[in-house]
Amino acid sequence: LIPLGAFAIVWSMEPSIFTKIINGELPCHKIYEDDKTIAFLDIYPIQPGHILVVPKQQIDHLDDLDDDTYAHLFRVVKMLAKRVKLVLGVQRACLTVQGFDVPHAHIQIIPCNQAADFYRIPDRSGKPNDQALGEMARRLATKEVVL
């Protein structure tokens, strides 16, 4: 038997899928990138334009980020949320922080016109639609927003 604490240490050392994206080991439909963060489309979006905003430093819990990275992450989220509303013409850019699927802190931006849009369960049974994701990424990546 492996003590739970030892398992947690070994498990946390594995690069997350987001770290693999950041390192260029896996592809993504990138919306934004700077020295501290990257933002890309969720391949199984709750709604079209569903963005994941991820710190480049792999930390499991958002509240464990250093203050500068935490603040920067939310500045990027604010900018991208405005961009989502402007480009997609939706009423809201809903935010969620869950962290159950990937052990790497991140914030999700989900375009919504009504509350039910936020709660839609995406179909993960098929292959992601790379053509639609690529077009959406181009639309969202090229619009500048002044904060």
Annotate each language-model stretch with its function.
Residues 1-8:
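Intrinsic disorder/low-complexity segments
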Residues 8-147:
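HIT superfamily nucleotide-processing domains
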